[in-house]
């Protein structure tokens, strides 16, 4: 690959400076621009190998610039940069033909590697895709790197109808991602039908999926369409697919292979065109090894895998998510949105959140109703949040260990709004150790100092500081 020519457009001079030097250091020729109008003017006489553009700029923004570039130079790869990391920005960039999406703050080495990949792509004369779809906004929020990967996958699948398997713990937002995949796909105007395998009695799953004929079983008084027929032309979301019985897995596999099925009690085949998005919190590979999930069905579903991280692995997103959920809850209840005190925001970020995003959302609803003031303080938070965090942090400890008791004390103190816990705890810890050591040595100070790992002078000073002389 020949060394390439890179143009950078950003109204932030510091970003231009950093990228210009990093790209020059990689042997690339870099020219910077302050706004989109300057880029379009320069494009009238020459063309780079790749363009990096900020998305939020005065005047012409990055998406408007991208649209004009794709009309004039459809083969030119454009990388969109933004500090506003959300799904709609990523999808809009991909749908309008962006080569890739680079959220700020970015790792400079990764940015250079992405530019070099785009140059290679351009020099190989590969035509990038250009799709004009403007899907509705969603409630998927995330600036964490793992969520940016999810946004990229949704953007890259915006012209596709292939099967997707979503993995993630309960409450991580798997159905939201499934909705987003549907909304940003060619099937967006067709139905999106969801079915949770774990919520349906096993003997009713076949009827729910495939429908039934009149008289197929006791109580089947009319013909009933199943979820496959309801989703014809659109998307069928099968949540908790790992709980699907093996016999139903066999029928599902046939539908995926043939595009047709029989209603329960029926003899005429029903043809459908349905995209399958499946989700699970289980390890399907392990279920396959245990003989509880068909391997051939697993491979049919696992064309594209999307992993949703638990909330504890994307703590930087918690404040923004909490503010969003407080605003949503306020709109639902017709009240003014609560505000988070900075200490409360920090406390939320430290919590365990075993229920993930769903638990955070429910907590924000609870706070909207139950918090006394307009500003949410630490003492307004429900106690079970701290109990679950303490339980998680002490799960590896003995139930009667001093560390467990210390963790429980710290939990109570934080809930009461205490600060500077170390300055409060350390004197008590030293007083307890001194008292115990002196009792053990029948008041012999030199021996007590030895047991504590102190010199005699240190012990004497500590006794004085703690008022124990």
From Swiss-Prot:
It is found in: Cytoplasm. InterPro entries: AAA+_ATPase (IPR003593), CheY-like_superfamily (IPR011006), Homeodomain-like_sf (IPR009057), HTH_Fis (IPR002197), P-loop_NTPase (IPR027417), Sig_transdc_resp-reg_receiver (IPR001789), Sigma_54_int (IPR002078), Sigma_54_int_dom_ATP-bd_1 (IPR025662). One of its GO terms (molecular function) is cis-regulatory region sequence-specific DNA binding. Residues 140-369 form the Sigma-54 factor interaction domain. The modification 4-aspartylphosphate is found at residue 54. Transmembrane segments: none annotated. Contains an N-terminal receiver domain, a central output domain, which hydrolyzes ATP, interacts with RNA polymerase and is required for phosphorylation-dependent oligomerization, and a C-terminal domain, which is involved in DNA binding, dimerization and phosphorylation-independent oligomerization. This is DNA-binding transcriptional regulator NtrC. It comes from Escherichia coli (strain K12).
